[in-house]
Amino acid sequence: LVSGANSFFILNKDTINKYAIPSKVLYPIVARFSYLNGVRHNQIKHKKIFERNDRSYLLSPNDEQLSCYESVREYIYSLSSNEISENKTFQKRPNWFEPNHGIDSVIPDAFLSYMIHRGPRLVINQSNINCTNSVHKVFFRDKSISHKNKIAISISLLSSYSQLSAEIVGRAYSSGVLKIEPTAGKSINILMDEKIIDPLYSLTNKIEELLDKEEHKEIRKLVDNVLIANGIIKESDCEKFSLGIDQLRSERYKGVKKYHE
């Protein structure tokens, strides 16, 4: 979603309370990928972001709501007429004050990291939550895919095979971060098979616990072990992939800072 003014339209708890903004004009939104933890996101997790006072709700009233709520009008028209008229994004919308409109309002199946220190992470959207354009929206072509299968795909992405694939197709920047463009994101290879859906899914809680601790090598090892145990990949290959990951990440941080997994 492109609001044209994230600092104005995406609100935190303090601003919502200060202006007494009603919930009817607010929509949960992921403003930054760094706010997401684990491999799934839901209303419970989003509430924690809100309670931390991070920007987490999109203000998007329609005509009727703008007329109905004085508090919303007070906030909306705190922008000057010049700020409104000079914003090109505002001019593209039927109502400049309603960013949750048209294609921007489409809710993704998952969120993919965009600019990253380590490798990419796919977070499954378990609720009706949108995201800004600083986060990639992901949609599964197979609309009948099970939730368990989605989680398994998200976890498989954390394998040494997929993380190396991301390092190869992504673009390294001078700051050392890896940028995953939409085309690159589609090119990341992920290993999946019916027989590994349940074993991968069973790792969900453990994976999320390790992600909170930033134990990325341990995560790769857990996922790789499932792939190895089910004959998807060889242990010797995983060792080579892990070595390749370390070398490529060290290379993109060369001259910036020392890389530590």
Task: Name each region found by the language model.
Residues 1-202, 209:
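Polybasic, glycine- and aromatic-enriched phosphate-binding surface used to engage nucleic acids
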Residues 1-5, 71, 194-261:
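Non-catalytic DNA-recognition/assembly elements of restriction-modification systems
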